[in-house]
Amino acid sequence: RLKVSRVSEDGVEDIVPRILRVIRLGQDVDKTHRFAEEALDRAYAAAREFAEVLKEHPVDGIRFVATSATGDAENREEFEDNIEQILGVRPEVIPGTEEADLSFLGATSVVRRDVEGPYLGVDLGGGSTELVLGGDGVSHPNTQVQAAFSMNIPAARRTERHLKNDPPTEAQIQEAIADIDEHIDEAFKTVPAGKTRTIIGVSGTVTTMTALAMGLTEYDHSAVDGASCSLEDAYAVDNKFLKMPREERLTYKTIHPGRVDVVGGGALLWNRVLAKVSEAAYADHGQRID
């Protein structure tokens, strides 16, 4: 993603709205512990494109943030050297805690004032999945993070590790659920998810599933940004696309071609987070999130 903004005492003004390119940098890292050559090629192509944009919009400073998928790769230095050569800035690999804070800040920035807190931000990333609880449940969502946990269960790796058939078998799905639930239960020891009143999803998986639940025939960021979705609708669309063959998923323009191979694992991960948080909320205050 690239975004160019002017920051002043009056706030933030977007000069170049968000540009998104799906590169799947974490492709096969779980298996090989290295960035795949095709993933690096996609990353460098996006970086060169961004460099051209920055030539048209000279900036005072650039921050290139990379997440945990970068830290896991043995050829990380090669990636960082090439990005620095293209953009003139070295990627900054941030810890999961900072990734969680930034995700929560971005997620709560689009929440309506009438939406009840505390808020649980869920970021299904390429290298990890963050759970961040915050907001005081009274005023407009603030940026106060109460608890956060980074789970080493990225959506793409659930597909690569468990959902190997197309479509996946029921046994593979149950194996993936057991793996995901174990990580979520561990996260809940740090994050009191039962206090959650509103779940805010962040990531291409979440926005894609939401767009499909809304019945959009093509992906529209402006329509999805800040949209709400019931758990019932989320479960239905998650299960549908988890069990859908790849060739059929390709017919949906709502799904970016770069996500077609991994959207099933992402859908299952999102499904389990929603279910486990709803169960925790019911146990905590006798009311499920709907």
Locations of regions flagged by a protein language model:
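A structural signal for short, well-ordered beta-strand segments
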Residues: 19-23
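Cationic, histidine-enriched alpha-helical/coil surfaces that engage anionic ligands
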Residues: 61
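Residue-level detector of high-confidence beta-strand sites
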Residues: 15-18, 148-150
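Helical "lid/coupling" subdomains associated with nucleotide-phosphate turnover
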Residues: 6-9, 24, 28-57, 69-118, ...
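N-terminal basic/disordered segments at the start of proteins
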Residues: 1-14
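A short acidic Gly-Thr/Ser loop motif
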Residues: 1, 122-128, 202-206
